[in-house]
């Protein structure tokens, strides 16, 4: 009897191991908030769910953001900013209080799975490397008290500059000046089965060495390969070469088994005059090819088939970030919700992307294209469903005072995102109250259901059947809906109108069915064997 139970037990263990082995690499998104006029966290959560993104990185533990992701199933990586490292490292009580206030009230409804302690501390001007490990240990102690030390992983993200050399990959090594910091931190990661977090940016390597690095090599578009003379390994793209450099550096320090997670990678869509490769076309090409590579062809030349999790940087352009122009233009979306370029996050679209090698950087403008994700669409600008299309605009007969009063209400209590009519935004010109009010009135009208009563504004507005959009200023239009679609009131922004229900997207349904078939095909023989045993 005991032998039979043991046999059944090990059969099921083997099955679970097999199913776990088949798990795919993961694509996540970085949700930075160093910008003005971003959509509310609730609206951002809606957008991320629609895009079917299951993994999100934030850079603090903002309560409003944590609440917005509650009960979504999205796995959240939260951050401890560099400015908080001293307090976290000095006193356990500080960390205990932080955990009690910022984590425990929202967990597990908000699925927090990891904490990144500090951001690229080796490159920070205040040199806070000595604070990272004490802070990590205090966080681990606090999590252990709450029984969460096995459920929430702790690590710290680094830039590639932590290496003293990165090419050829086999000769890569960590900088000696960081060895005193790295070795005990890596021991902590091994002890707690946490990943080594690295931010990889082939863009910077290309920008700083355009005469040596082909753009195609940085964009996953190269038809030739670079050889590592020591190993003979061939590299067709820079991302793999950078990632293998990390693997080799870890091996050189006797930490070969540490899992690596890429916590940032992306490409800017706009840059300074000298950053000619910072274009929307190249950003789309890099991120599209990165997703396809990670999902469809996992691993690197040194570690073929190795599962690797990658977080794309970033969801939004962040206009408050200091530095050169490209620093503020890594996002897939503008702050007003229009897409900088339409990225397929699934990796299933095989349409070729066309990078550009322009001699002058181009300035991306808000797109009027739908954002396609599988078979679901977010309609941008003057799209919409069937039936008579109507818009609500400001009446030319209304006084400036009446228009301004109604505009202030729409952008305030009316909950309209009016960032599109701010300076340097697509609907700022013409800079008149009549024009700005028209945009705000229509956004409120469409978000509220596009009924005549929603276009009253005390007589300061009128309904029209001609699309008032002009240039890059796109007016929302609410599409016709049926039992399978839903119109969002208080949507992502004035330019995102409606989304198919993300509750059962075709891609997720197909994947669930595929996994079920695999499970049944493996379990069924087991049941036959088990029946014969009994």
From Swiss-Prot:
Residues the record marks as active site: 120, 264
According to the record, the signal peptide region is 1-24
The source's domain of life comes to Eukaryota
Q: What subcellular locations does the record give? A: Secreted, Cell wall; Cell membrane
Which residue ranges does the record annotate as region Disordered? 348-379
Could you give a single Gene Ontology term from the biological process aspect? cell wall organization
**Keywords for this entry?**
Cell membrane, Cell wall, Cell wall biogenesis/degradation, Disulfide bond, Glycoprotein, Glycosidase, GPI-anchor, Hydrolase, Lipoprotein, Membrane, Plant defense, Secreted, Signal
Q: Which reaction does it catalyse?
A: Hydrolysis of (1->3)-beta-D-glucosidic linkages in (1->3)-beta-D-glucans
**Propeptide, residue positions:** 508-534
The GO terms this record gives for MF are: glucan endo-1,3-beta-D-glucosidase activity
Q: What class of enzyme is it?
A: hydrolase
Presence of keyword Amino-acid biosynthesis: no
> What Gene Ontology terms describe where this protein resides (cellular component)?
extracellular region; plasma membrane; side of membrane
Per its UniProt record, what Pfam families does this chain match?
Answer: Glyco_hydro_17, X8
Which InterPro entries does this entry report, sorted A to Z? Glyco_hydro_17, Glyco_hydro_17_plant, Glycoside_hydrolase_SF, X8
Task: State whether keyword Transferase applies.
Answer: no
* Protein's name in the database: Glucan endo-1,3-beta-glucosidase 12
